[in-house]
Amino acid sequence: MDAITCIKTRRSIRKFKSDAVSAEDIKDIVLTASYAPSWKNTQTTRYIAITDPELKNRISKECCGEHNQEIIDNAPMLVATTIIDKRSGFERDGSYTTVREDNWQAFDNGIATQTFCLAAHEKGLGTVIMGMYDIDKAAEILEVPEGQLLMALIGVGYPDEQPDVPKKKTVEDLLKFR
């Protein structure tokens, strides 16, 4: 599928079939996501693929509200994205490179996460990015290494729904020429 079609047809999927997601597919998706641009090519995003039902259940029940619990319980795989802290947007001495301070880390992770989701869509997998959960508790459960920060949880699986295209803003609302 071409890039424009992939971008325009990807939807957030919240209902999944029970079919397992292969390790090879996830490896291919992460490889593709590694091509996402990042600050000075720091490539700070890391991925944790979670298929262990007990681990998924703990994250669902101990870290999430009801809506995200349903998604995680239904998804055959949960992927957590982390970043290596204090690299993206920082100088070697630890000072900020830009006025955005440490926010650049989230920007880079967002680019990598979107690229991950597009690569998954190209393989016929659905994804939904979740940001509302107890980050500290989830990081503890996942044993996120020291020096990394947990950023997002992504439900991954074969879609069991075909959501409509959500209403989009007009180009006139989004773009200004000066």
Annotated model-derived regions:
Residues 68-78, 143-165:
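A glycine-rich helix N-cap at a beta->alpha junction
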Residues 83, 132, 158:
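Short secondary-structure boundary segments
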Residues 41-109:
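Glycine/small-residue-rich phosphate/adenosyl-binding loop
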Residues 26-34:
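A structural motif
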Residues 33-34, 79, 97-141:
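Small-aliphatic-rich amphipathic alpha-helix that forms the alpha element of a beta-alpha
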Residues 3-13, 18, 87, 92, ...:
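C-terminal helix-cap and adjacent tail motif
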